[in-house]
């Protein structure tokens, strides 16, 4: 976590079946880009947030339901889904052959404990925790994306406010946990 997250230059280390499938997809696009000269942007999205789904929903709903929050994956990145959608379209102008890698997420490294405590303030509840924060986490450094396109339009604190309001208003959920706390790739 102290490194600021993995940049596009870091060789991926795919842990678990899902991560391996994502890496395989990248390799196929890289092959096509090299073999056929097709311009490609490898859009590496980390934790897009929507009100019915996402790591913020997972944390907020646990705080609201007074369920303990696992701390082993002590921090994460996230970005508003609308900003991610815009960046997906805008990233087409960066496409290159060989393929261009682009990490896409928000600028903050967000502490799970901090996010839970922020939701606790909004809900008037004290979050419960289990485990201890590990010294590492799955993080992206999206500074290249921010240099190319600027910072996301929706801030982290705005996402926290919207998520809390959604849950307080009884908003719906997709019932698909992100498993952000998973450290061994078993989703």
Annotate each predicted stretch with a short phrase.
Residues 1-16, 35:
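Active-site "gating" loop of Rossmann-like NAD(P)-dependent oxidoreductase/epimerase domains
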Residues 15, 26-83, 119:
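NAD(P)-dependent short-chain dehydrogenase/reductase
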Residues 17, 21:
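Active-site helix of classical SDR
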Residues 44-48, 70-79, 100-110, 132-135, ...:
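Glycine-rich Rossmann NAD(P)(H)-binding loop
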Residues 81, 112, 152-156:
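Amphipathic alpha-helical segment in the mid-to-C-terminal domain
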Residues 82-93, 161-164:
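Amphipathic alpha-helical segments that line or abut small-molecule/effector binding pockets
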Residues 87-144, 182-186:
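Mid/C-terminal beta-alpha module of Rossmann-like enzyme folds, strongest
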Residues 156-187:
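Amphipathic terminal alpha-helices
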């Amino acid at each position: 976590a102290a490194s600021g997250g993995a940049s596009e230059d870091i060789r991926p280390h795919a842990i678990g079946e899902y991560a391996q499938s994502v890496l395989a997809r990248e390799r196929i696009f890289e092959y096509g880009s090299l073999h056929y000269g097709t311009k490609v942007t490898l859009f590496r999205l980390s934790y897009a947030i929507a009100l019915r789904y996402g790591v913020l929903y997972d944390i907020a709903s646990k705080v609201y339901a007074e369920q303990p929050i696992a701390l082993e994956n002590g921090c994460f990145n996230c970005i508003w889904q609308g900003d991610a959608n815009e960046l997906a379209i805008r990233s087409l102008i960066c496409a290159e052959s060989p393929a261009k890698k682009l990490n896409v997420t928000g600028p903050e490294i967000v502490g799970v404990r901090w996010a839970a405590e922020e939701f606790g303030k909004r809900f008037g509840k004290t979050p419960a925790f289990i485990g201890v924060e590990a010294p590492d986490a799955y993080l992206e450094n999206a500074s290249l994306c921010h240099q190319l396109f600027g910072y996301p339009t929706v801030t982290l604190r705005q996402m926290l406010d919207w998520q809390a309001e959604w849950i307080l208003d009884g908003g719906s959920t997709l019932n698909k946990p992100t498993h952000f706390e998973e450290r061994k790739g078993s989703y």
